[in-house]
Amino acid sequence: MTILIAYDGSDDSKAAIAFAGELLKGESAVVLTVWERAAMASARASVGLMMAIDQLGTEDAAIEGAMRELAEQGADLARQAGLVATPRCDPDSVAVWSTIVDVAEEIDARLIVTGTRGFGGVRSLLLGSTSDRVLHHAGRPVLIVPAPDAASDAVPDAEPGADAVT
């Protein structure tokens, strides 16, 4: 079985790797870091902040190098967690979530593992609604691991296993 783990270096994505390792120790995993091309990021920025076209290629190469290192860091964490991990780094095709879904299809992942949210702003690799969109578009099982501090958000004195609405 091959699993796909979305990784952006955030605490949420680190928690997703750790949980996948606990649950699926010894399984094969592809640790995917998705990055946004500078041209796409600039197009989303205000027109006054756009870079010269020739700078974008240089910036993309630098970003890709950093993202490859980040993917390798994620794969190292996955190996430490007991998974047989391979790093992978892809630029987003349309949106981060669609790249995750596309890669899962390409590698025939039996499961996609992601955190609940990643970094925001320019460093965003797993946007706030990315895990939700992956869940609804993947066509395969998706494991969404809550943030490490989600336990502190629990309602005190609730019965174990009880859901609470606040």
Predicted regions and their residues:
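Small/aliphatic-rich secondary-structure junction motif
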Residues: T2-Q55, L83-T86, V165-T166
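Solvent-exposed polar/charged
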Residues: E22, E105-E106, H136
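Acidic, proline/glycine-rich short linear motifs
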Residues: V34-E69, D102, A151-T166
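Structural beta-alpha unit
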Residues: D76-I112, S152-D153, G161-T166
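Glycine-rich, Arg-bearing micro-motifs that act as flexible, cationic patches
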Residues: L111-R133, H137, A147
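Short, flexible loop segments at boundaries between secondary-structure elements
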Residues: R140-S152
